[in-house]
């Protein structure tokens, strides 16, 4: 299952590149033809793919909020993880894999063909106008010590045993978690990739003058933070879009 989830994250890198966004607005990208989703629309929501194992704890809560937000204007149907995994693996096999047999490089064309194959299985009659591939992805936030900003949000860095002078150690880029939505039309043509910042997964300590970074056990516990991030990622699907220049 981990391999299946990892394959799904390739599209975001294809569209936005490998560099991560460090500004305070979501780094959204749209196809030239995308003008937003007419309301109401029928949306097929695929399972959330966590970028890392530690993000799996947030899948249930974020899924609930995502469905709730989308249902304010659209009809939403979900797909179970077992059904999705089986269909996606079959789609990959049908196109001969999505990596080059000679170089091992990711094959963008085959990836998009696999998406089209997948939707022929999951959306054969074209009943759904939009199909969403959601993921919990690692991003880079711009930290100024006490706070970090990325993908439309500002979050406080959690620290223990630090005075103001020592915050300078965490100026610059720090890891963050965002919700990424890759949206396609019913035939598998890419429409948009949108983001919303969720949480900072780490907290920081200094003991015996040694700085340490720790993974939060409860990184997805702040429901207000999750709600804000989900709402930001969903905005391009709830009305007309303002495209980044």
Where would I find each of the regions flagged by the language model?
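C-terminal motif of bacterial Sec signal peptides marking the signal peptidase cleavage site
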Residues: 15-17
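C-terminal/domain-edge helix-coil "capping" segments
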Residues: 19-40, 126, 138-245
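Soluble periplasmic/extracytoplasmic beta-strand elements of cell-envelope proteins
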Residues: 42-47, 131-135, 180-182
